[in-house]
């Protein structure tokens, strides 16, 4: 079993969260910070993906490091405090203060994916937080597939989609879009390597 503690918000193409949800019986079972991290992951994946090419938040980990092509990205879209904070009893509900507001924020580790219709139209982003970033990526991938919002047109992975690329060795990512392996918890890396085969992306008939 591979699971995350925090269920995902997903946002529209206008970068406003459409919903915020938590897993478990109550919000106290979640990491409090995961609510915002998940929303920022959705915002990031939506912001860096387009109609012809998708980048997951995992794909931009190495690219955002000093000396790489996206260095400085994390400073470009600060978190919107008016959307992030409010009555904590509404967090993870339809009345969450972030719903319908531009949340902002950029996250450059796994758990955020762009959403595409069956015809390949980009619709927004999905973010999951609450476990290792590798497990968050797996949960987001499986959920996107279940929702049938994974008609990814192209991406940087060897399978030509936005799957996590685990190619960082000695601080270097040959692809330029690598993500480190994750420590702690149930290892997700073997699952990640089979996601494209078990839960394929691409245009749907």
What is the predicted function of each stretch?
Residues 1-205:
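Flexible, solvent-exposed loop/hinge segments and secondary-structure transition points
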């Amino acid at each position: 079993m591979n699971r995350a503690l925090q269920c995902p918000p997903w946002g529209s193409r206008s970068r406003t969260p459409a919903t915020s949800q938590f897993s478990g019986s109550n919000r106290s079972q979640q990491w409090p910070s995961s609510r915002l991290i998940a929303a920022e992951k959705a915002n990031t994946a939506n912001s860096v993906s387009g109609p012809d090419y998708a980048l997951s938040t995992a794909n931009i980990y190495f690219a955002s490091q000093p000396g790489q092509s996206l260095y400085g990205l994390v400073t470009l879209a600060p978190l919107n405090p008016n959307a992030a904070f409010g009555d904590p009893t509404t967090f993870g509900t339809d009345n969450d203060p972030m719903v319908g507001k531009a949340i902002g924020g950029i996250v450059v580790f796994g758990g955020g994916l762009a959403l595409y219709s069956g015809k390949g139209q980009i619709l927004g982003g999905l973010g999951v937080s609450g476990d290792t970033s590798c497990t968050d990526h797996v949960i987001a991938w499986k959920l996107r597939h279940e929702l049938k919002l994974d008609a990814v047109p192209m991406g940087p992975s060897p399978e030509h989609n936005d799957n996590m690329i685990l190619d960082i060795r000695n601080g270097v990512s040959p692809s330029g879009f690598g993500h480190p392996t994750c420590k702690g918890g149930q290892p997700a890396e073997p699952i990640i390597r089979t996601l494209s085969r078990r839960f394929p992306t691409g245009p749907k008939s």
